[in-house]
A protein has these predicted regions:
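FNR/FR-type flavoprotein reductase catalytic core
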Residues: 66-203
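Structural signal for conserved beta-strand scaffold positions within catalytic alpha/beta enzyme cores
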Residues: 10, 51, 152-154, 201-203, ...
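Ferredoxin-reductase
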Residues: 2-78
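Short microdomains enriched in Cys/His and/or Lys/Arg
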Residues: 233-242
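Local cysteine-cluster metal-coordination motifs and their immediate loop/turn environment
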Residues: 185-186, 204-233
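Short, Lys/Arg- and Gly-enriched loop/turn segments at beta-strand edges
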Residues: 42-49, 87-94, 229
Length: 242
């Protein structure tokens, strides 16, 4: 974990109430998520990392309250205090040859970096991305540029398969030996209970400190209590109690 000031180099609307922010600066430590300090607010906002490279990271977030509204209005050049290098992420080594990535809504962005790592290891990657409707679709082209196959589902049927990610999976029946999922808890529960074989899920819980001190994001697992921010947010399928 490292705290530093990072400068906004991009902050733009990419879908309904959804923004892409790029931060640049020295000393960025890679992690599964970051904790951003917003001026005027005591609690930081945890945001998952969509992409990362030396001195530069990309975040995708949705305006859901006053804090993220303030964040969306920040101009290029503004500096933010950010904790980087947080969380235990996905394990690309767990996949032997064929990976299935299942994302829903704001659970889609962190899977993009995972897709790039899997492809760099020579593995086949199928991504199934679920959204409510067409104007909420994000990063579809970015996934198509990386993955072997990309399937889209929308609840209203405006794009791709009508229904949920599990409907798209049932229709396409992709081959995989390991799956990774991130999105709404109800979606991940169905995915983990439906898909056979091993996999991992990235959980989302309300966080206080984001560093494991306050235990505000503690969950019960088959291995006892675990902190989502410190021991996760990624957990093996077999660890989770739904």
């Amino acid at each position: 974990m490292k705290k530093n000031l990072y400068k906004i180099s991009e902050n733009k609307l990419i879908a309904s109430k959804t923004f892409k922010m790029v931060l640049e600066g020295d000393g960025i430590v890679e992690g599964e998520f970051v904790d951003i300090g917003i001026p005027g607010y005591f609690l930081r906002r945890p945001l998952s990392v969509c992409d990362w490279e030396e001195g530069r990271m990309t975040l995708v977030y949705k305006v859901v309250g006053e804090g993220t509204k303030v964040l969306s209005e920040m101009a290029v050049g503004v500096e933010l205090e950010v904790l980087t290098g947080l969380g235990r992420g996905f394990d690309p080594e767990a996949c032997r040859e064929r990976a299935l990535l299942v994302g829903g809504g704001l659970g889609v962005p962190p899977l993009l970096l995972l897709a790039k790592r899997l492809k760099a290891q020579g593995k086949q990657v199928t991504a199934v991305l679920g959204f409510n409707k067409a104007d909420e679709i994000i990063l579809a082209e970015e996934f198509r540029a990386v993955c072997d196959e990309v399937l889209i589902s929308t609840v209203d049927g405006s794009v791709g398969v009508k229904g949920f990610v599990t409907d798209a999976i049932a229709a396409a029946r992709p081959s995989f030996d390991y799956f990774y999922t991130c999105g709404p808890m109800v979606m991940m529960k169905v995915v983990c209970n439906t898909l056979e074989g091993p996999g991992e899920a990235s959980l989302e819980e309300r966080m206080g400190c984001g560093a494991g001190f306050c235990y505000g994001c503690s969950i019960q697992t088959k291995n006892g209590p675990r902190r989502v921010c410190k021991d996760g947010p990624v957990f093996k399928k077999e660890e989770l109690i739904w």
